[in-house]
Amino acid sequence: MKKMICFLIAAISLGTISGVSANTIKLPTPNLPGKTSLKTALEKRCTKRTFSSRDLSELDISNLLWAAYGINRPNGKRTVPVARGIYAIEMYVALSDGVYYHQLGDNILKKVTSADMRADSDSRKMGAKAPLVLVMVADKNAFDGKGDHYIAMEAGAIMQNIYLFCAANNFNTVVCGSFKRDLWSKALKLPANKYVILTQIVGNQR
Protein backbone atom coordinates (compact mmCIF):
# COMPACT_ATOMS: atom_id res chain seq x y z
CA MET A 1 0.00 0.00 0.00
CA LYS A 2 2.81 2.40 0.93
CA LYS A 3 4.52 1.71 -2.40
CA MET A 4 1.29 2.44 -4.25
CA ILE A 5 0.78 5.75 -2.39
CA CYS A 6 4.38 6.77 -3.08
CA PHE A 7 3.91 5.89 -6.74
CA LEU A 8 0.73 7.97 -6.99
CA ILE A 9 2.35 10.95 -5.28
CA ALA A 10 5.32 10.72 -7.63
CA ALA A 11 3.03 10.47 -10.66
CA ILE A 12 1.01 13.49 -9.57
CA SER A 13 4.18 15.47 -8.91
CA LEU A 14 5.58 14.61 -12.32
CA GLY A 15 2.30 15.55 -13.95
CA THR A 16 2.33 18.91 -12.20
CA ILE A 17 5.91 19.58 -13.19
CA SER A 18 5.16 18.60 -16.79
CA GLY A 19 2.15 20.92 -16.81
CA VAL A 20 4.25 23.87 -15.69
CA SER A 21 6.98 22.97 -18.15
CA ALA A 22 4.50 22.73 -21.02
CA ASN A 23 3.29 26.25 -20.33
CA THR A 24 6.68 27.85 -19.75
CA ILE A 25 9.61 28.24 -22.12
CA LYS A 26 12.98 29.26 -20.71
CA LEU A 27 14.69 31.07 -23.55
CA PRO A 28 18.46 30.92 -24.02
CA THR A 29 20.61 33.96 -23.32
CA PRO A 30 20.50 36.36 -26.30
CA ASN A 31 23.53 36.03 -28.54
CA LEU A 32 23.28 38.14 -31.67
CA PRO A 33 25.64 37.22 -34.51
CA GLY A 34 26.74 40.83 -35.09
CA LYS A 35 27.96 40.22 -38.63
CA THR A 36 25.80 42.85 -40.33
CA SER A 37 26.65 46.55 -40.22
CA LEU A 38 24.06 49.16 -39.31
CA LYS A 39 24.40 50.58 -42.83
CA THR A 40 23.54 47.22 -44.38
CA ALA A 41 20.61 46.69 -42.02
CA LEU A 42 19.21 50.11 -42.88
CA GLU A 43 19.62 49.45 -46.60
CA LYS A 44 17.80 46.10 -46.29
CA ARG A 45 15.07 47.35 -43.93
CA CYS A 46 11.69 46.84 -45.59
CA THR A 47 8.24 45.29 -45.19
CA LYS A 48 7.76 41.78 -46.55
CA ARG A 49 4.41 40.04 -46.28
CA THR A 50 5.31 36.46 -47.22
CA PHE A 51 6.71 33.96 -44.76
CA SER A 52 8.04 30.43 -44.61
CA SER A 53 6.15 28.25 -42.15
CA ARG A 54 9.46 27.03 -40.71
CA ASP A 55 9.68 27.79 -36.99
CA LEU A 56 12.19 30.18 -35.50
CA SER A 57 14.59 28.62 -33.02
CA GLU A 58 14.37 29.53 -29.34
CA LEU A 59 17.63 31.45 -29.75
CA ASP A 60 16.14 33.38 -32.68
CA ILE A 61 13.14 34.30 -30.51
CA SER A 62 15.38 35.32 -27.62
CA ASN A 63 17.53 37.48 -29.89
CA LEU A 64 14.44 39.02 -31.48
CA LEU A 65 12.89 39.95 -28.13
CA TRP A 66 16.17 41.40 -26.88
CA ALA A 67 16.56 43.55 -30.00
CA ALA A 68 12.94 44.66 -29.78
CA TYR A 69 12.75 45.67 -26.13
CA GLY A 70 15.54 44.04 -24.18
CA ILE A 71 17.71 45.25 -21.33
CA ASN A 72 21.02 46.51 -22.75
CA ARG A 73 22.62 48.19 -19.71
CA PRO A 74 23.37 47.24 -16.10
CA ASN A 75 20.93 49.90 -14.87
CA GLY A 76 17.98 48.08 -16.46
CA LYS A 77 17.47 50.48 -19.34
CA ARG A 78 16.37 48.99 -22.63
CA THR A 79 16.98 49.13 -26.37
CA VAL A 80 14.29 51.79 -26.89
CA PRO A 81 13.94 55.40 -25.72
CA VAL A 82 11.01 56.14 -23.39
CA ALA A 83 9.51 59.22 -21.77
CA ARG A 84 10.25 59.89 -18.08
CA GLY A 85 12.00 56.54 -17.76
CA ILE A 86 8.62 54.77 -17.82
CA TYR A 87 8.29 51.55 -19.82
CA ALA A 88 4.64 51.30 -20.79
CA ILE A 89 4.66 48.25 -23.06
CA GLU A 90 4.80 44.50 -22.47
CA MET A 91 5.69 41.94 -25.11
CA TYR A 92 3.73 38.81 -25.97
CA VAL A 93 4.63 36.12 -28.49
CA ALA A 94 1.95 34.32 -30.53
CA LEU A 95 3.02 30.85 -31.67
CA SER A 96 1.10 27.95 -33.20
CA ASP A 97 0.37 26.45 -29.78
CA GLY A 98 -0.77 29.64 -28.07
CA VAL A 99 0.23 33.10 -26.90
CA TYR A 100 2.99 33.66 -24.36
CA TYR A 101 3.84 36.60 -22.12
CA HIS A 102 7.53 37.50 -22.16
CA GLN A 103 8.80 37.79 -18.59
CA LEU A 104 11.69 40.08 -19.37
CA GLY A 105 13.95 39.77 -16.34
CA ASP A 106 14.04 35.97 -16.43
CA ASN A 107 13.75 35.73 -20.24
CA ILE A 108 10.87 33.30 -19.88
CA LEU A 109 7.78 32.84 -22.04
CA LYS A 110 4.66 32.05 -19.98
CA LYS A 111 1.59 30.78 -21.80
CA VAL A 112 -1.56 32.84 -21.27
CA THR A 113 -3.80 31.06 -23.79
CA SER A 114 -3.59 27.91 -25.89
CA ALA A 115 -5.53 29.56 -28.72
CA ASP A 116 -3.69 30.03 -32.00
CA MET A 117 -4.12 33.79 -32.50
CA ARG A 118 -1.66 34.32 -35.34
CA ALA A 119 -4.37 34.76 -37.99
CA ASP A 120 -5.96 37.48 -35.85
CA SER A 121 -2.83 39.63 -35.90
CA ASP A 122 -4.04 41.58 -38.94
CA SER A 123 -7.16 42.14 -41.02
CA ARG A 124 -5.64 40.27 -43.99
CA LYS A 125 -4.75 37.24 -41.84
CA MET A 126 -1.14 37.29 -43.03
CA GLY A 127 -0.01 35.97 -39.69
CA ALA A 128 -1.79 32.64 -40.23
CA LYS A 129 1.12 31.30 -42.28
CA ALA A 130 3.91 32.84 -40.22
CA PRO A 131 5.58 31.01 -37.34
CA LEU A 132 5.47 33.95 -34.93
CA VAL A 133 3.70 37.21 -34.16
CA LEU A 134 4.98 39.73 -31.63
CA VAL A 135 2.22 41.50 -29.73
CA MET A 136 2.79 44.85 -28.02
CA VAL A 137 0.49 45.48 -25.05
CA ALA A 138 0.33 49.05 -23.75
CA ASP A 139 -0.71 50.34 -20.32
CA LYS A 140 -3.04 53.36 -20.48
CA ASN A 141 -2.25 54.19 -16.86
CA ALA A 142 1.50 54.46 -17.37
CA PHE A 143 1.31 58.25 -17.63
CA ASP A 144 -1.89 58.77 -15.63
CA GLY A 145 -3.91 58.43 -18.81
CA LYS A 146 -2.20 61.42 -20.45
CA GLY A 147 0.62 59.76 -22.33
CA ASP A 148 -0.84 58.26 -25.51
CA HIS A 149 1.79 60.04 -27.61
CA TYR A 150 4.57 58.71 -25.38
CA ILE A 151 3.23 55.17 -25.71
CA ALA A 152 2.97 55.53 -29.49
CA MET A 153 6.57 56.75 -29.61
CA GLU A 154 7.70 53.73 -27.58
CA ALA A 155 5.80 51.28 -29.79
CA GLY A 156 7.31 52.89 -32.88
CA ALA A 157 10.82 52.45 -31.50
CA ILE A 158 10.13 48.77 -30.77
CA MET A 159 8.72 48.32 -34.26
CA GLN A 160 11.82 49.79 -35.90
CA ASN A 161 14.12 47.66 -33.73
CA ILE A 162 12.28 44.58 -34.98
CA TYR A 163 12.58 45.74 -38.59
CA LEU A 164 16.33 46.29 -38.25
CA PHE A 165 16.85 42.96 -36.50
CA CYS A 166 14.94 41.17 -39.26
CA ALA A 167 16.87 42.98 -41.98
CA ALA A 168 20.19 42.06 -40.35
CA ASN A 169 19.23 38.41 -39.85
CA ASN A 170 17.34 37.62 -43.07
CA PHE A 171 13.85 37.43 -41.60
CA ASN A 172 10.71 38.91 -43.13
CA THR A 173 8.44 41.17 -41.09
CA VAL A 174 5.39 43.41 -41.33
CA VAL A 175 3.87 45.58 -38.63
CA CYS A 176 0.07 45.62 -38.30
CA GLY A 177 -2.33 48.12 -36.78
CA SER A 178 -5.60 46.80 -38.17
CA PHE A 179 -6.96 43.98 -36.00
CA LYS A 180 -9.74 43.27 -33.50
CA ARG A 181 -8.41 44.74 -30.26
CA ASP A 182 -11.33 43.49 -28.21
CA LEU A 183 -10.64 39.94 -29.37
CA TRP A 184 -7.02 40.20 -28.25
CA SER A 185 -7.93 41.78 -24.92
CA LYS A 186 -10.29 38.92 -24.18
CA ALA A 187 -7.85 36.20 -25.28
CA LEU A 188 -4.99 37.65 -23.24
CA LYS A 189 -7.28 38.39 -20.26
CA LEU A 190 -6.06 41.98 -20.18
CA PRO A 191 -7.32 44.39 -17.50
CA ALA A 192 -9.26 47.45 -18.61
CA ASN A 193 -6.18 49.68 -18.55
CA LYS A 194 -4.23 47.55 -21.05
CA TYR A 195 -4.68 47.06 -24.79
CA VAL A 196 -2.83 45.74 -27.84
CA ILE A 197 -1.32 48.71 -29.65
CA LEU A 198 0.53 46.89 -32.47
CA THR A 199 1.26 43.41 -33.74
CA GLN A 200 4.27 42.49 -35.84
CA ILE A 201 4.56 39.32 -37.89
CA VAL A 202 8.01 37.73 -38.17
CA GLY A 203 9.17 34.70 -40.12
CA ASN A 204 11.85 33.13 -42.22
CA GLN A 205 12.10 34.14 -45.85
CA ARG A 206 10.40 31.84 -48.36
Predicted regions and their residues:
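Positively charged n-region of N-terminal signal peptides that target proteins for export
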Residues: 1-4
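Bacterial N-terminal signal peptides
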Residues: 7-16
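N-terminal amphipathic, basic helical "cap/leader" segment at the start of enzyme domains
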Residues: 20-130
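Short, small-residue-rich loop/turn micro-motifs
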Residues: 31, 136-140, 204
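Small-aliphatic-rich amphipathic alpha-helix that forms the alpha element of a beta-alpha
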Residues: 45, 64, 91, 132-186
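Flexible, glycine-rich phosphate/dinucleotide-binding loops
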Residues: 100, 108, 143, 182, ...
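Short coil/turn connectors at secondary-structure junctions
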Residues: 129-131, 193-194
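A glycine-rich helix N-cap at a beta->alpha junction
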Residues: 190-206
